[in-house]
Amino acid sequence: MIVALKVKRIEMGTVLDHLPPGTAPQIMRILDIDPTETTLLVAINVESSKMGRKDILKIEGKILSEEEANKVALVAPNATVNIVRDYSVAEKFQVKPPERVEGFLRCPNPNCITNDEREPVDTVFVRESKKPLEYRCRYCERTVREDQIRELIRPS
């Protein structure tokens, strides 16, 4: 039997695997990836023996740091990061929720200073707990739960 790859291999870069279906676009925003400047291979809602369905994001030519990759845990807590060199996986690790999240989440409190258009203040959230995953706004102390994070990601 001949097996064909649906998504081509990359020579050097980062592969984010085991992403919940439909999360690849949000992850691109979290990582501040500009698809007009980066070669990307995005597979959305593909079959997975582990998850049933999943997304895969291949970022060619860019090795994500562990700190960058850990931001992915906000929407994909079981994601796997594969660092690829010379078409082979050189490193592999699971993401972990970051201690601090800056700039790309919006505070749900409409009265928070970060939501005042006259004040150019970026959001800063500090992790309060891992299970359940919760973050607290540094400015207004509002808590953000894991189930709220996806809807609070700022559009690019």
Swiss-Prot record:
Membrane-spanning ranges: none
Cofactor: binding details: Binds 1 zinc ion per subunit.
Binding site for Zn(2+): C107, C112, C137, C140
Cofactor(s) required, per the database record: Zn(2+)
Cellular component terms per the entry's GO annotation: aspartate carbamoyltransferase complex
An MF annotation (GO) of this entry: metal ion binding
SUPFAM superfamilies associated with the record: Aspartate carbamoyltransferase, Regulatory-chain, C-terminal domain, Aspartate carbamoyltransferase, Regulatory-chain, N-terminal domain
Pfam families: PyrI, PyrI_C
Coiled-coil features, chain-numbered ranges: none
GO BP annotations, alphabetical order: 'de novo' pyrimidine nucleobase biosynthetic process; pyrimidine nucleotide biosynthetic process
Top-rank taxon: Archaea
Swiss-Prot/TrEMBL keywords: Metal-binding, Pyrimidine biosynthesis, Zinc
Function: Involved in allosteric regulation of aspartate carbamoyltransferase.
Protein family according to the UniProt entry: Belongs to the PyrI family.
Oligomer and partners: Contains catalytic and regulatory chains.
Protein name as it appears in the record: Aspartate carbamoyltransferase regulatory chain
